[in-house]
């Protein structure tokens, strides 16, 4: 398993949500990055508001840490409605979901994180709720059992997932709006770092924000996490201002290199280079070589490496690119 203190792991850590909540943007006007998503959502939200209707059900997918929960809350704020949040693993029984649905008010947002982890029984309850705003529930047991239908207020379901391919077709097809979040540019992350530094009362130079952004793997959650560690370093070792030099010293100290890689990324890449001659190599072999779960490799380690052009997924397995060799000062494999 990846250690819980891995700073550039984009999955949320305990108590991190309460810290990040204070610095998250509340409205689309403050939302930076994802320009196509932002443009589309502005139109869809304004249209729904002008018609006095609930927004179509929205599916948000993409790697962890890119702001799926933030966007869900922004949608609710823009619509000026309540949002009730839960997650797929929490909804163990159909009754758990029924209790949430029956407490919604007209136009409210129901946010289900990790929606791909809903059980089939719970998912069956969602279908009529999403399509017809009705709840089908069973009363009684055995031969005397009967089904009754309850009308629900119009609501918007927002589902978030890192594994859109794991959704069943009937569920996926019921979302009228589907948005994919992409990794953020250094420019957008620099803005986010500067904004967060302001909320943390930390003096931040533009160059310092860029240095943090470059090592944040295109992910706001990681950028904010690294910012907090740089703040600690600055408080103890510097005069209180984060410039490029201070940011670089702090990030080197916590073992996040200029490409945003930590020991696990380097271990992954070196395993393919040294143990498997640069690939191709199957996921099972990589998982065994580095002592990591396949799902974690696919969901946490590989997306950024692929996006940055360090590895390729091919039908024959994983292959490292010349970039990976250059990162370690090695000569690429000759075919």
From Swiss-Prot:
DNA binds at residues 313, 318. One of its GO terms (biological process) is DNA repair. It catalyses: ATP + H2O = ADP + phosphate + H(+). Mg(2+) binds at residue 69. It is found in: Cytoplasm. Residues 4-184 are annotated as: Large ATPase domain (RuvB-L). Keywords: ATP-binding, Cytoplasm, DNA damage, DNA recombination, DNA repair, DNA-binding, Hydrolase, Nucleotide-binding. Residues 185-255 are annotated as: Small ATPAse domain (RuvB-S). Gene3D superfamilies: 1.10.8.60, P-loop containing nucleotide triphosphate hydrolases, Winged helix-like DNA-binding domain superfamily/Winged helix DNA-binding domain. ATP binds at residues 23-24, 65, 68-70, 131-133, 174, 184, 221. InterPro entries: AAA+_ATPase, AAA_lid_4, DNA_helicase_Holl-junc_RuvB, P-loop_NTPase, RuvB-like_N, RuvB_C, WH-like_DNA-bd_sf, WH_DNA-bd_sf. Its main location: cytoplasm. Residues 258-335 are annotated as: Head domain (RuvB-H). One of its GO terms (cellular component) is Holliday junction resolvase complex. Its EC number is 3.6.4.-. SMART domains: AAA. GO terms for molecular function: ATP binding; ATP hydrolysis activity; four-way junction DNA binding; four-way junction helicase activity. Homohexamer. Forms an RuvA(8)-RuvB(12)-Holliday junction (HJ) complex. HJ DNA is sandwiched between 2 RuvA tetramers; dsDNA enters through RuvA and exits via RuvB. An RuvB hexamer assembles on each DNA strand where it exits the tetramer. Each RuvB hexamer is contacted by two RuvA subunits (via domain III) on 2 adjacent RuvB subunits; this complex drives branch migration. In the full resolvosome a probable DNA-RuvA(4)-RuvB(12)-RuvC(2) complex forms which resolves the HJ. Belongs to the RuvB family. Has 3 domains, the large (RuvB-L) and small ATPase (RuvB-S) domains and the C-terminal head (RuvB-H) domain. The head domain binds DNA, while the ATPase domains jointly bind ATP, ADP or are empty depending on the state of the subunit in the translocation cycle. During a single DNA translocation step the structure of each domain remains the same, but their relative positions change. The RuvA-RuvB-RuvC complex processes Holliday junction (HJ) DNA during genetic recombination and DNA repair, while the RuvA-RuvB complex plays an important role in the rescue of blocked DNA replication forks via replication fork reversal (RFR). RuvA specifically binds to HJ cruciform DNA, conferring on it an open structure. The RuvB hexamer acts as an ATP-dependent pump, pulling dsDNA into and through the RuvAB complex. RuvB forms 2 homohexamers on either side of HJ DNA bound by 1 or 2 RuvA tetramers; 4 subunits per hexamer contact DNA at a time. This is Holliday junction branch migration complex subunit RuvB.
